[in-house]
Design a protein with these regions (language model features):
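Catalytic-site neighborhood detector that most strongly recognizes the C-terminal catalytic loop/helix
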Residues: 34, 130-155
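Short pre-functional
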Residues: 1-11, 30, 114-115, 157
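Short, polar N-cap/turn motifs at the start of nucleic acid-interacting alpha helices
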Residues: 22-25, 101-102, 121-140
Length: 166
């Protein structure tokens, strides 16, 4: 689950709604309708993500007739809820959510966007890959790009501080 957010930028709700039929192994793509925007999205997945998905489906996913890729590990099986997506990912890794984990799986989505920007991809492509309906929505994701943010800083040379600084 974490790799789908980190390597494809998927929202947790879309990860939890992902169905086995949404994965095309021949073309190496995932196609689905986004929950938030209602827009269809098709993304290629890297081989490592495909291998992890295949391993989970074949070796980790409980055997059942549910169409969802990610399901609860205990009977009665149901699809995972997006509110449990991150904690379920941690549980698989043998970890627990800490009080500092306020963003959950969404931080992986931000990291994905920052990596695309650092690689020189245009904002329009990043926005499209994230499935945003409005290109300006991507700005909050890109604020984590410290290198480019430092280029926006204004120099303070020649400006004197007066008064008391508390």
């Amino acid at each position: 689950m974490t790799m789908l957010a980190l390597r494809l930028g998927l929202r947790s709700v879309d990860i939890c709604n992902l169905r086995l039929s949404d994965i095309c192994w021949k073309s190496g793509t995932i196609s689905f309708v986004q929950q938030k925007t209602g827009q269809p999205l098709t993304l290629p997945f890297p081989v490592e993500v495909g291998n992890l998905l295949a391993r989970y489906i074949l070796e980790g996913r409980p055997k059942c007739d549910l169409p969802n890729v990610f399901i609860t590990l205990k009977h009665p099986y149901t699809r995972l809820r997006s509110s449990r997506c991150y904690t379920s990912s941690l549980a698989i890794l043998g970890r627990k959510k800490s009080a500092a984990d306020v963003r959950g799986l969404h931080i992986a989505r931000r990291t994905f966007a920052s990596h695309l920007l650092a690689a020189g991809n245009p904002v329009s492509m990043i926005s499209s890959t994230l499935g945003h309906a409005d290109e300006s929505t991507v700005d909050e994701y890109l604020a984590t790009d410290g290198h480019r943010m430092r280029q926006c800083a204004i120099g303070l040379a020649g400006i004197e501080l007066t008064g008391v600084l508390i």
